[in-house]
Amino acid sequence: MSELNKLAAGEWYQFKAAEVAAQKARAAKLCQEFNQIDATNPDAQTAKIQEILGSYGRNLSVQAGFNCDNGRNIHVGDNFLSNYNLTILDIAPVHIGDNVMIGPNVDIYTVNHPLMASGRRANLAQGHPVTIGHDVWIGGRAVITPGVTIGNNVVIAAGAVVTHDMPDNTLVAGVPAKVIRQLE
């Protein structure tokens, strides 16, 4: 089984394998091109980010400083807005719903590495999808970890580290993040 097939199946794979590295190199090149586009040319920015993403809805707005591992695994809905320096390590799929706003310096991770040093020395990794619902606001410097599902109408406070699923209609904060209160 190829390393990309292992990755797609959610199995441990060699993250330094040539086929995996080629995906990352493609994404790195496209992200570099996107990040060099003049901010006064939003049409060029939109065209380049559309080339990077797997799928996207209407009214897409992504600020410079965007980085990803693959790009094709990122799927965003309508009215998506991200501020500066969004990093999405999309080894596994990342699905983001409609009307989502992401603050500056947010990190979304789908990749995990072994706890045992022997597995890390063997360059092993494993992907776990991330799903973000509709009408979500993610505050600046928040971190979303592998395998997390965030419900609809959720506000994630700045600096939160989300390590487990979050239900609909909640305000989430802290390290690790927890539900602070219900939203109406």
Q: What positions do the PLM features span?
A:
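Acidic, glycine-centered active-site loop in nucleotide-sugar glycosyltransferases
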Residues: 166-168, 173-176
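Short-chain dehydrogenase/reductase
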Residues: 137, 155, 171-173
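Flexible, glycine/small-residue-enriched loop-and-beta-strand segment within the central core
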Residues: 39, 66-76, 81-149, 175-176, ...
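Terminal amphipathic alpha-helical/low-complexity segments used for targeting or macromolecular assembly
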Residues: 1-59, 177-180
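C-terminal/domain-terminus segments
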Residues: 153-165
